[in-house]
Amino acid sequence: MRTPAIVLALAPAAAFGQAALWGQCGGQGWTGAKTCVSGAVCQAQNEWYSQCVPGSGGGNPPTPQPTQPSNPPPSTGSGLNAKFKNKGKLYFGTSMDHYDLNKAQLTNIVKAQFGQITNENSMKWDAIEPSRNSFSWTNADAVVNFATANGKLMRGHTLLWHSQLPAWVSNINDRNTLTQVIQNHVTAMVTRYRGKILQWDVVNEIFAEDGSLRSSVFSRVLGEDFVGIAFRAARAADPNAKLYINDYNLDIANYAKVTRGMVEKVNKWVSQGIPIDGIGSQAHLAQPGGWNPASGVPAALRALAAANVKEIAITELDIAGASANDYVTVVNACLQISKCVGITVWGVSDAISWRPNDNPLLYDRNYQPKAAYTAIMNAL
């Protein structure tokens, strides 16, 4: 698989003379090489980023194919995904990662039951670009290749997040440097998987609980501007992927993180031309009586769907105790909202859940379906 040469994007022209295939060759503030190696032509992606793409004499790069038709055909299978798609949705998916690929019980369930995969960790910044301009694709590639081989859609998770962030990024305090680093990282990732990712979580967990921006290197150095920088870079790299803003605690309709945070800010950013296609609600839910039980999800999803975005999705669903009624409540909430295109549960089995004491998933520690699984199947 091709490794983009964007790793050279910040190298001075004097050192390299010409930019390599897929390397940066222009844009506002660019001082590096502005001509491309033989067999490539410099093409402007936007005002701040030009890239060496295959061709000669000014030809365009190959047009990426749409990742998913807007109206998927009915599925003829019998698992969760098939039944959910037959209700008009795009997918019922799960998270997994490269370290799960040798677990036969898990992969067999994924193949039979789920239609979409999210990398749990291997697409996060510390895994992909642990040091500046040094990219490590092996683990992320393994999951994408598994998904492609088995006909599964992919959600890319995540391009910008304050956590699992290398120190070399966290320590940046210069606006221009951080802008270039974001553009380079986002472009490298989205370009590599262009045409293979249905939805990208472009920015993840950027809001504090009061709806303000979370304090992070991105907000401290760039203010709100990092959102537009990241989304525009992602759109330029893959015009067909759906671009999401993703967060947790979006499960109560009148909570500030939903109202003053997600809905208000997204509407403002979309009005400014920032290409935000969707809102992802993680939905790490509590048991009844807890802070954010499943009973709040229907109204919360309606509040999110009222934002000026094309679609919404439940992106990391797990529910403490895995009550059958709670899972059916969430599934029905998505079914009743046309903008809700899919549900992803955050893991296959309680044996590998990040909430091991809550037993929050659809399969138990022995990879056997629980009552919640049966209830969803019956509801569909």
Swiss-Prot record:
It is an enzyme of class 3 (hydrolase). Its main location: secreted. The active site is at 205 (proton donor), 316 (nucleophile). GO terms for biological process: xylan catabolic process. Pfam families: CBM_1 (PF00734), Glyco_hydro_10 (PF00331). Residues 74-379 form the GH10 domain. Residues 22-53 form the CBM1 domain. Pathway: Glycan degradation; xylan degradation. Its EC number is 3.2.1.8. Keywords: Carbohydrate metabolism, Disulfide bond, Glycosidase, Hydrolase, Polysaccharide degradation, Secreted, Signal, Xylan degradation. Induction: Highly expressed both in culture with rice cell walls (RCWs) as a carbon source and in infected rice leaves. Residues 53-80 are annotated as: Disordered. One of its GO terms (cellular component) is extracellular region. Endo-1,4-beta-xylanase involved in the hydrolysis of xylan, a major structural heterogeneous polysaccharide found in plant biomass representing the second most abundant polysaccharide in the biosphere, after cellulose. Belongs to the glycosyl hydrolase 10 (cellulase F) family. This is Endo-1,4-beta-xylanase 6. It comes from Pyricularia grisea. The gene is XYL6.
